[in-house]
Amino acid sequence: MSAGAGAAVEAGFSSEELLSLRFPLHRACRDGDLVALCSLLPHTPRAHLAAEDSFYGWTPVHWAAHFGKLECLMQLVRAGASLNVSTTRYAQTPAHIAAFGGHPQCLVWLIQAGANINKPDCEGETPIHKAARSGSLECITALVGSGAHTDLRNASGLTAADIAQTQGFQECTQFLLSLQNHQMSRFCHNGTLSGGHESILPTHVSLGTNRKRCLEDSESLGVKKARTRVPSLDHAMPLANGEAEDDADRMHVDRECAAVSDMKNSSSVLNTLTNGSVVNGHLDFPCANQLNGMESRSHPCLTGSNGVSNGQPLSSGQASVSANGTEEPEKTMGINPEMCGSLHLNGSPSSCVASRPSWVGDIGESLHYGHYHGFGDTAESIPELSSVLEHTSCVRVEQRYDSAVLGAMQLHHGS
């Protein structure tokens, strides 16, 4: 029969009759006619299992997947049909067709049989894009549970969530967006964004009572964040990283600040005699500006190599006062005014770190010494040293207070 005669014969048939005559496998899969399919398969060459019809360009497997005929789909695959066969026109696999048709049972079976669920079609869309177009939350759930990528974009730059939102499927949109946000959050917290391995423990849990903070507490510009006070309940357990010790430190600082305030109100001379305070269990002599409210830390304070201050550095134009009330000659310390509170100035890692950059604001009110350079409260990490220094500092503050009062009385009475 010539091509013209064949065309004339086909022109006289309806599409239904033409489908039954020329594509009996396709018709059986469309109708779910398992008896007819099983009778045709033994006599059908394997190459005909991949034949495309003249209507949609689908193979029998695509027809079974689109209409949700799971039994026909299983028989075709057992007879040798391919799971990942792509159509010539749109490069769509049976998984694309099942997802777009909204048939999760066929889609799940294809996935379990080994179908590729991340293969794009001619538009760059994977099966999850097709499920989003049809609004099938069951198919989306099946695909996601099997490892489908929700962040893939089609040729138009749209993700599955974008397509679902465009089609008006709000439930699918919210589900896909929540998955994307959860995956991105877990991706960042586990450190895999920078090529690291996933963290086994949560980021806020530490295995010890070390007061040092990890590098994750650093800001993007390299400045270490101040240790903030975590609000706790009465029955809350102390944190594993030792932050519960901060309360005792702050109480000690408040007590010493109150003592300095009382001495400052006694006499103007006491403002010069009283030149020390205790910060975090260490004896720290503040600068001149600190005596006026104990607030400013813009001038450097010298600290000894053991973490205990040896005395108050004298700034330009300031003279020291001896115990008998006489002024000593003015001394000038050659200290870089830009240095920001190194814990140890000699032989420690802090001394090798550059001074505080000019673009960093006044962080003295929120950071104790040693915080900027990233080495934490080193001396506080040793419990024995911290206890000894705390006791010693209390005794020395009390002695200074008595000496200051005595000196003020002697100056007042002129003795």
Curated annotation (Swiss-Prot):
Residues 303-325 have a biased composition (Polar residues). Transmembrane segments: none annotated. It comes from Mus musculus (Mouse). This is Ankyrin repeat domain-containing protein 10. ANK repeats lie at residues 20-49, 56-85, 90-119, 123-152. InterPro entries: Ank_Repeat/CDKN_Inhibitor, Ankyrin_rpt, Ankyrin_rpt-contain_sf. GO terms for cellular component: nucleoplasm. Keywords: ANK repeat, Repeat. Residues 303-330 are annotated as: Disordered. The keyword Repeat applies. It comes from the Eukaryota. The keyword Repeat applies. SMART domains: ANK (SM00248).
